[in-house]
Amino acid sequence: MDKKKVLIVDDEPDIVTALKFNLELENFECIEAYDGEEALLKAKNENPDLILLDIMLPKINGYKVSRLLKFDESYKHIPIIMLTARAQEKDIKVGEETGADEYITKPFEMDKLMSVITKYLGD
């Protein structure tokens, strides 16, 4: 069986490294992007099964990345989980309006994140 592919988008290299390490332990293939522009390119070129997306990104923010992908017929099927320190109700509402499937605030428990990923990608 092919590994499920997860695109990790965050401008903090330590967060990307930690997520990648944990996801690879669970047998996921990981793709990395460090800004919104790179995220869009990799989403379109790599065809990930799921995207972990920070909001506060250089070049194009996570809200816009989510909106651009979710309102494009070719990519709207890809689940997007927003991972962000922005925990106010208005931020969550904007995340939902952009089409994000889940909104998880930092800091988060890896077990919780893995259960959400499994919800979308199966075991």
Where are these regions (language model features)?
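Charged docking surfaces used in two-component/phosphorelay signaling
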Residues: 17-25
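The feature encodes the CheY-like receiver
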Residues: 16, 58, 76, 88
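Active-site beta3 strand of CheY-like receiver
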Residues: 46-52, 57
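Short hydrophobic/Thr-rich beta-strand motif most characteristic of the beta2 strand and flanking loop
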Residues: 27-34, 42
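C-terminal output helix
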Residues: 108-117
